[in-house]
Amino acid sequence: MYENRSGSQRSDHDARKAQQEAVRDFATSVAGTLGSAGAGLWPDAVAAPTGDLLKLHEAAAEQGWFELGSESALDFLVAASRELGKRACPLPLADAYVAIQVLPEELAARVGEGELRVVLSEVAPDGAGGLGPLEGAQHATHVLVLDRASGRGELRPVASAAYEDGLAVPAWVRISTGDAVAQVEVEPARLRVLLDAQRLAVAARAVAAGARMHELAVAHTVVRRQFGKPIGAFGAVQQRTAATEIDVMAATALVDQAVQVALAEAADADTGHVAGLAVDLAVRLVVDTATGIGFGAQHTLGAIGFFEEHEASWLFRRVHADKLLLARGARDAVARALVHEGRSLPRLDLGERAESFREEVHAQLARHTTDGVTDPEGLRAEMSRLGWFALGWPEADGGLGASTEEQVVLHEELKYAGGPVDRAMSATMLLGHSLLRHGTPEQKEAFLPLIREGRMAFCLGYSEPEAGSDLASLRTKAVRDGDEWVIDGQKSWTTRAQTASHVWLAVRTDPDATPRHAGITIFLVPMDTPGIEVQPHVALSGEISCTVFYDGVRVPDSARVGEVDGGWKVITDALAAERVVMGGVAATMRRNLDALLTVLRRAPHEVADADLARLSSLAARLQAARVLVVRATRAMEGAEARTVGPVAAVLSGELAEELAEASIELLGPAGALAPGTPDSPQAAGAVSFDAALRVAPMYVIGGGTNDIQRGIIARALGLPRE
């Protein structure tokens, strides 16, 4: 049974907050040491060809940067790596982080003090002791050669070093080595954890370099004028800038999640062994997106970012160099873990209360599911008894007062189960919360019990032939006639209108209002009201959607929800609930991915390497979408609140199309058959890859198209309107 345990996590939350503040303070300290505004040891990326790595190494040692490994302070390492990335600086901080944890105590102390300047290599020297190309080895005194498989390694002195000119600046280096001065042996599993930390630091550095390019490009869109207006006002620039922002946020989010998983696993062995997969997912996404981020920024900056006086040209080199370092690993590591090892995407921890509630939801779903088929009526009745349809309502209104995270859990798990009570949940999220805020006592008395029981059969009357994403342009009108309103107009693409008892209807009550959204009012209208005509249509997905005509429909003023001309407030208040609902798309994609993996695991060795690489990229993007949904749920105000929701929506929607297409192509013609048919790989009742493909476009165009969402992202970044 659900319990409100609001005080049980306060100490953990406070501890996490304190740790985050400490990491931020450390990053600020690192930035201060590096410098800014053209002054300091390495103030910006323009210092890349002339910066003194040796002097910076000495300063870093004085500040204790090389001792992070002795504390296994991965979050601090990643924070410092980001500051280095912003400045295109390849200080081998992560190499020292690993070395100090595997070398004998006396040598480790010398690394921490900066006396030994160590770089890592997973490649053994050639017969003559030569080794290269190596990153950040210009002033290295030693190289630590490690074998990931065996856990063995050796520390060799650097006899000489020579620059190898090319893409990387500072240049990569080829060294010659002397005989080993120390042998090391580490448990292979432990060594993999340490080397994963190094990979994660490089990934963070690469994303930070790309993000700095993006930051410069965004600023450029506001000040650079062409054809009489800022270039940020052009739609093409807005779309590209928003797409780049999506990649930056997604890659950053996965790096952050990998850090959190690794720290949790280090603190508690009972959490499982998922950190390696979390790192692989982050690295996969960084490899896929980092250089695209750089190119996108370069395209926006134009010629100004193409010359060496500008940071972008040096950041461009850093992004590409770091990507090459990361890409040396297996491109299909994620998919091999999922397909060959039977692993699942790392679970997202929403906190003790939410995760405890997740187990309750799992138990109820299992109780009402037989042979993979859920009994929707039995589940609805039990959820009504438990009060779950009013989970997030205040206790004073008959709800359970649950946290947003617990509401997310319920919505996610129901969607992962195939959405057996979708309509009831939609009524809760979209109607229930709005009625609580704006409904009259009579409306609350009439409708809240139905919603609480999961029996409210409604449809949403928003879209019109000329009003889709631009809801403020709706034309269906309501004219007051005494105590009644007369409604005339047409609504399009109204899902479930043919079975609805009521429509949540947005109409124009002031045709002359400025701005346009100021003249909209909401009504809750019975669908059997005279003058309403429903015309069903079968969608590409096979679902029924309807055109609904309103011809002289008379409704009493008591059907109005909220103030006259105040409907926009009622509509936008529902966005608070939308933060919870948006997790449903990502949960559906996870369900579809798991269904695909179930089929592929029957013959894992028949999956081609190229298909595994493709699957790895899709899995990484799905995990990023899931992480961003959680961030959107928790973002209440500020720039992130305006950006992260649309970012998660765009990423999830486009992923739905790509995952559905990949599923069909990986399985061949059999994958396009309905489950249960003789040649289908799926039993009856299982996920239909055919249906997933046909419904996928709606995730991109429904509820505000992705193009519009990217425009919202661009404006949140400060770009002007077209």
Language model regions located:
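Glycine-rich phosphate/cofactor-binding loops in nucleotide/flavin-utilizing enzymes
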Residues: 2-18, 98, 303-366, 572, ...
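C-terminal helix-coil-helix/basic helical segment that borders enzyme active sites and/or dimer interfaces
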Residues: 2-6, 10, 38-47, 226, ...
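Glycine-rich beta->alpha junctions and the first turn(s) of the following alpha-helix
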Residues: 2-28, 164-249, 346-352, 356, ...
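Internal helix-loop-helix
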Residues: 5, 13-16, 20, 24, ...
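A short, Trp-centered hydrophobic/proline-enriched beta-strand micro-motif
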Residues: 113-126, 454-462
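A short core secondary-structure module
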Residues: 115, 119-121, 128-166, 172, ...
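A structural signal for short hydrophobic beta-strand segments in well-ordered beta-sheet cores
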Residues: 143, 476-478
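Extended, hydrophobic interaction surfaces within ordered domains
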Residues: 214, 229-342
